[in-house]
């Protein structure tokens, strides 16, 4: 173990393109490293844009026990085994209605997440892509999607990068003061409640454990990881991370397909 990291009490790890390989699996080596980290008394939390339905299999495969998971990029903290909700903040209904009205007008692909259900208008290449990448099972509601009364945990727009740029430009003046717009991938635009982020959720979780943010190492790759990377005592971006994530991190570790996170942990924390 690197003595300069002897104060670390917790690690927060993003899932997609950080912990998970491109085939959505984790190596036995990574599983062993995380198990040894827990045995040493260092807490682990997964911090992801995913919903519980698709984050749980990741945690179960790692055999982490009943760890808290930061879901929906900070909109929900939920325990892995018990499904107990520690914290939840939904997207305001008024903003959702305006977003869905625009989506209907311009035929955007918008997904809604309510009660651990993934709700779409109809099946298309975007829903197929999301299901294949995360293992989620979508429900297709047709125009009923635009009439939902319950506030969602998150909305997400999926499209080609140039179209996501246009969607972002359209939504920012419309609801930018009421929601947070953040990309989890270049072609995924997440829409979550204002003042919700992985970093804010991690701060809340750390307070619950009596752990200062200076005692946490975070790992990430994408725009929705930046709030977390910028708030923890030490931040590590994977080699495949977007440039902004690398800029706010103290260090860049290996590629997500090469056990980059686990190799850094073994070298510095074990």
Spans of model-derived segments:
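Conserved acidic, metal-coordinating active-site core of Asp-based
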Residues: 102, 106-219, 223, 227-228, ...
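Active-site phosphate-binding/coordination module
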Residues: 25-127
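A general structural signal for well-ordered alpha-helical segments in protein cores
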Residues: 52-55, 96, 164, 199, ...
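Short active-site oxyanion
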Residues: 41-45, 65-67, 154, 214-215, ...
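Asp-based phosphoryl-transfer active-site loop
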Residues: 7-23
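Mg2+-dependent phosphoryl-transfer enzymes with acidic/Ser/Thr/Gly-rich catalytic loops
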Residues: 2-10, 27, 190-270
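Hydrophobic packing residues within well-ordered alpha-helices of enzyme cores
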Residues: 30, 55-59, 167, 171, ...
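Short, structured coil segments at secondary-structure junctions
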Residues: 62-65, 73, 174-177, 231-232, ...
């Amino acid at each position: 173990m690197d003595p300069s990291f002897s104060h670390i009490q917790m690690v927060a790890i993003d899932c997609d393109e950080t912990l998970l390989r491109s085939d959505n699996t984790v190596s036995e080596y990574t599983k062993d490293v995380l198990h040894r980290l827990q045995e040493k008394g260092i807490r682990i939390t997964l911090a992801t844009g995913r919903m519980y339905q698709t984050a749980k299999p990741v945690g179960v495969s790692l055999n982490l026990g009943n760890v808290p998971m930061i879901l929906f990029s900070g909109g929900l903290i939920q325990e892995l085994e018990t499904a107990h909700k520690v914290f939840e903040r939904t997207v305001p209904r008024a903003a959702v209605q305006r977003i869905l009205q625009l989506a209907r007008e311009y035929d955007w692909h918008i997904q809604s997440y309510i009660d651990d259900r993934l709700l779409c208008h109809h099946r298309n290449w975007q829903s197929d892509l999301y299901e294949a990448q995360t293992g989620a099972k979508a429900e297709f509601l047709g125009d009923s999607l635009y009439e939902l009364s319950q506030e969602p945990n998150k909305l997400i727009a999926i499209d080609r990068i140039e179209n996501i740029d246009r969607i972002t430009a359209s939504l920012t003046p419309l609801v930018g003061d009421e929601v947070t717009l953040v990309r989890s991938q270049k072609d995924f635009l997440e829409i979550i409640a204002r003042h919700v982020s992985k970093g804010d959720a991690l701060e809340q979780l750390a307070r619950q454990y009596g752990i200062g943010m200076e005692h946490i190492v975070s790992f990430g790759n994408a725009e929705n990881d930046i709030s977390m990377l910028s708030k923890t005592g030490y931040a590590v971006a994977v080699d495949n991370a977007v440039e902004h994530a690398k800029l706010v991190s103290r260090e860049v570790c290996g590629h997500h397909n090469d056990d980059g996170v686990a190799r850094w942990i073994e070298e510095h924390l074990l």
